[in-house]
A protein has these predicted regions:
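Tryptophan-centric aromatic hotspots in well-structured domains and transmembrane helices
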Residues: 23, 60, 69, 131-134, ...
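Catalytic helix-loop patch of NAD(P)-dependent Rossmann-fold dehydrogenases
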Residues: 5, 14-56, 60-61
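Mid/C-terminal beta-alpha module of Rossmann-like enzyme folds, strongest
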Residues: 102, 109-160
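NAD(P)-dependent short-chain dehydrogenase/reductase
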Residues: 44-91, 97-105
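Short acidic donor-binding/metal-coordinating loop in glycosyltransferase active sites
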Residues: 11, 58, 125
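Helix C-cap/helix->beta junction micro-motif
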Residues: 1-3, 49, 142
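Residue-level signal for the nucleotide or nucleotide-sugar donor/cofactor binding architecture
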Residues: 33, 91-94, 129
Length: 167
């Protein structure tokens, strides 16, 4: 009725992570968890409800505030000299500020009548690393040489919702 745009954030959990290469917007989805299934169901419901939608799939979001990997690593480092971090899951860490800038650019484009912005996008920063590589880089950049980041497997770090191995 008001011609609004539906803006939605989704996740890499809509994929099973079995691919050895990065996923694109056209890659087939195959969620490996209930969480991923719910996110995919949300995407599908939005796309069915209106053509005037923007869905941004993001992954590995981090920032200096809130609950995220960066903050968790800093907190864990304060408690000891060794941190165990998964090394066999690959992805693209995404700075929350950059995602906000992408969102802003899309909203501004839509406000100017750019209807080409509707659809599904993957919104992540460039590059690929493992959680272990990400943690190692964090401590290298802040100069915490005394922190040891030990590589472990996904099986050694179980989670309630299985993460895609490559996203």
């Amino acid at each position: 009725e008001i011609d609004a745009v539906f803006m939605h954030y989704s996740t890499d959990f809509v994929f099973d992570g079995a691919s050895g290469v990065p996923y694109t917007e056209n890659s087939p989805t195959a969620p490996a968890s209930v969480y991923g299934q719910s996110k995919l169901a949300g995407e599908e419901a939005i796309a069915a409800a209106t053509e005037r939608h923007v869905i941004l799939r993001t992954a590995w979001l981090f920032s200096s505030v809130g609950h995220n990997f960066l903050k968790t690593m800093l907190r864990l480092a304060e408690g000891g000299s060794e941190i165990r971090v998964v090394a066999d899951q690959m992805g693209s860490p995404t700075y929350a500020w950059d995602l906000a800038q992408v969102t802003r650019a899309i909203v501004e484009g839509l406000a100017k009548g750019n209807d080409d912005s509707f659809g599904l996008y993957h919104a992540v920063n460039g590059g690929v690393t493992s959680w272990h590589g990400f943690a190692t880089k964090i401590f290298d950049l802040i100069g915490w040489k005394e922190v040891r980041v030990r590589a472990i497997s996904t099986e050694e770090y179980p989670t309630p919702a299985p993460r895609p191995r490559f996203s």
